[in-house]
């Protein structure tokens, strides 16, 4: 075996350690395993994976002090998470989640949670929080469902086996099980539904270790929600590896339960077709390689190819359709053929949404960025139209029209025309909505301009709107202006599927020059997504930007510590904290590959 690169430290020879050891031996990986109790002064490899979660507050403090000493010369998996105050404490986890409530999904609820030093303090908090019995008492540093007690009446708190200060208390949520979502290196490895066995004495516990029964969550809307929630939670805690537990109540509402930074995965592995040990050791190997050679744009491409099975379906389809359309390489199309049936099966449902404007008005009011809310209410059907048009477009441009071109026959032309004209007559809303509005106009042009010239787009009018003064606020104005212009160019290319008309290229050059000035005027606040999409558009129309090498340098310096993908490290973009995951940053990363690695198959013909 080669010189050891990875050290796995453990306390007990668990299923997880055995799985890691077996996978390392089969693949002849340079990994060594050692007992935590035998470690004295130094770590015998450049990368450390600490596999133990049995801690008290005192032992955690000692461990974290030792890890900090080692971190100067060793890459420690989950070190960023460990550095946060008391992150293993369940009460602290709920405090952190409460602090991040502004950018976590409103649909992921929190459970009323508190700690108490005395019995009187316990009763006061129960009253103040309006909690009814039963109440759940959990060891604040517990794991595997051990030591959890149900307090069915107020007097039960006097009979807990440990001191009150050792517990965290939560309102009891009647449930039909919970979900364990395993996040590895910025992506969700898999997710399972766990439910207490009816034969178990612990009918309130869903943990597999306490007799719970596990079932893999199938592809679908619920799985997409769980992936989105779990990756954002992992990002909040800056975790490379974690198990995110989400409770489902009897009505189907989802609640954040806890995060486990040393998750067991035997139950999940029994349901998953993918090896957790293989995935984790791949991430540890990448972490080692980053200590030797800085990752490159090619590293992004290799990473997303490798983790494709673990991306959300939305991210996976987005990545591989863009790579196929950009390069013409049929292997990218092949990679997502298995996803297409489920994706396209919703077209009829999307068309139904168009015929029910009231439901779309309601959803428009509650979704997306706040500054767009009024414009969405004025033009509520745009998102529903786009959902249909994009699926039909990619059916044609990626899969040669195998499925759903005929679905457009079900689109009411009068309603579409009135929606289109209303948007064109409202330049303020058009600019405010930016990306979805511009996409809608170009999709209408693509599908309907031949039969009805009123759908033909005039890019000079879009340029006038982009150059006009706006009052959205500095950050919102920048974001809207950049995406307004870049999506006009992407739309002109039929979303990467054809060359832009040579006659229109000079006008689009002017539009991109305006975008370049916008980015340059506020470079530190512009996101990597803004910048990479700008360079992609420059390649589409043959525009030579003075910012090319500046943006390339920023991309190369912006790799996450959790995997070979880039994130917003060197700018102040406000969404950074919730998107430091491979799934959340997929859009930016595929743009980076398109901008700086892959060649565009339609060479611009500049006139």
Provide a role label for each language-model segment.
Residues 11-113:
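Conserved N-proximal alpha/beta basic substrate-recognition cap immediately N-terminal to
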Residues 108-132:
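Rossmann-like NAD(P)H-binding beta-loop-alpha module
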Residues 144-234:
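Phosphate-binding site of ATP-dependent enzymes
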Residues 199-207, 222, 500-589:
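Accessory, usually C-terminal, subdomains that scaffold auxiliary metal cofactors
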Residues 202-256, 277-288:
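A long amphipathic alpha-helix within ATP-dependent nucleotide-binding catalytic cores
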Residues 260-273:
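Glycine-rich phosphate/pyrophosphate-binding beta-alpha loops
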Residues 290-349, 353-356, 384-425, 457-460, ...:
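Terminal, non-catalytic domain-edge segments
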Residues 368-529, 539-541, 548-556:
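Eukaryote-skewed repeat-based solenoidal scaffolds used as protein-protein interaction platforms
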């Amino acid at each position: 075996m080669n010189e050891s690169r990875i050290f796995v430290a453990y306390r007990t020879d668990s299923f997880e350690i055995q799985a890691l050891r077996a996978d390392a031996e089969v693949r002849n990986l340079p990994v060594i395993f050692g007992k935590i109790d035998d470690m004295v002064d130094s770590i015998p490899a450049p990368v450390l994976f600490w596999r133990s979660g049995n801690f008290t507050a005192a032992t955690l403090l000692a461990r974290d002090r030792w890890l900090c000493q080692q971190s100067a010369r060793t890459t420690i998996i989950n070190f960023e998470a460990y550095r946060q105050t008391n992150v293993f404490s369940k009460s602290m986890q709920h405090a952190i989640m409460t602090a991040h409530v502004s950018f976590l999904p409103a649909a992921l609820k929190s459970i009323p949670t508190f700690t108490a030093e005395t019995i009187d303090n316990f009763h006061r908090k129960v009253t103040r929080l309006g909690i009814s019995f039963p109440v759940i008492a959990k060891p604040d540093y517990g794991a595997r469902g051990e030591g959890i007690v149900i307090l069915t009446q107020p007097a039960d708190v006097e009979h807990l086996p440990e001191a009150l200060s050792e517990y965290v208390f939560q309102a009891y949520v009647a449930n039909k099980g919970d979900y364990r979502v395993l996040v590895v290196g910025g992506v969700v490895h898999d997710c399972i539904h766990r439910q207490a066995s009816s034969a178990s004495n612990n009918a309130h516990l869903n943990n597999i270790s306490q007799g719970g029964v596990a079932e893999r969550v199938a592809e679908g809307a619920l799985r997409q929600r769980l992936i989105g929630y779990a990756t954002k939670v992992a990002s909040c805690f800056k975790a490379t590896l974690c198990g995110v537990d989400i409770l489902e109540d009897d009505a189907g509402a989802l609640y954040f339960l806890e995060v486990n930074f040393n998750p067991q995965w035997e139950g999940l592995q029994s349901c998953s077709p993918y090896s957790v040990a293989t995935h984790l050791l791949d991430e540890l190997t990448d972490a080692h390689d980053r200590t030797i050679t800085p990752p490159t744009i090619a590293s992004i491409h290799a990473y997303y190819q490798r983790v494709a099975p673990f991306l959300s379906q939305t991210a996976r389809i987005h990545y591989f359709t863009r790579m196929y359309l950009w390069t013409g390489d049929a292997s990218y199309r092949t990679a997502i053929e298995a996803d297409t049936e489920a994706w396209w099966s919703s077209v009829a449902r999307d068309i139904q949404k168009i015929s029910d404007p009231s439901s779309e008005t309601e959803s428009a009011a509650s979704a997306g960025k706040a500054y767009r809310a009024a414009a969405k209410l004025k033009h509520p059907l745009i998102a529903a139209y786009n959902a249909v048009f994009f699926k039909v477009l990619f059916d044609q441009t990626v899969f040669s029209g195998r499925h759903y071109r005929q679905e457009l026959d079900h689109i009411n032309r009068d309603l579409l025309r009135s929606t289109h004209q209303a948007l064109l007559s409202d330049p303020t809303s058009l600019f405010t909505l930016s990306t979805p509005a511009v996409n809608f106009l170009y999709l209408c042009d693509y599908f309907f301009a031949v039969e009805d010239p009123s759908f033909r787009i005039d890019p000079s009018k879009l340029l006038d709107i982009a150059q006009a003064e706006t009052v959205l606020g500095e950050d919102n104005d920048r974001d809207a202006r950049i995406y307004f212009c870049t999506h006009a160019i992407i739309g002109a290319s039929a979303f990467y599927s054809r060359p832009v008309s040579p006659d229109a290229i000079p006008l689009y050059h002017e539009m991109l020059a305006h975008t370049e000035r916008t980015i340059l005027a506020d470079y530190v606040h512009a996101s990597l997504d803004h910048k990479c999409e700008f360079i992609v558009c420059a390649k589409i129309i043959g525009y030579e930007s003075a910012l090319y090498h500046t943006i390339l340098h920023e991309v190369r310096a912006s790799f996450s510590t959790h995997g070979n993908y880039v994130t917003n490290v060197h700018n102040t973009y406000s969404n950074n904290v919730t998107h430091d995951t491979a799934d959340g940053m997929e859009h930016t990363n595929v743009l980076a590959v398109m901008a700086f690695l892959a060649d565009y198959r339609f060479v611009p013909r500049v006139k």
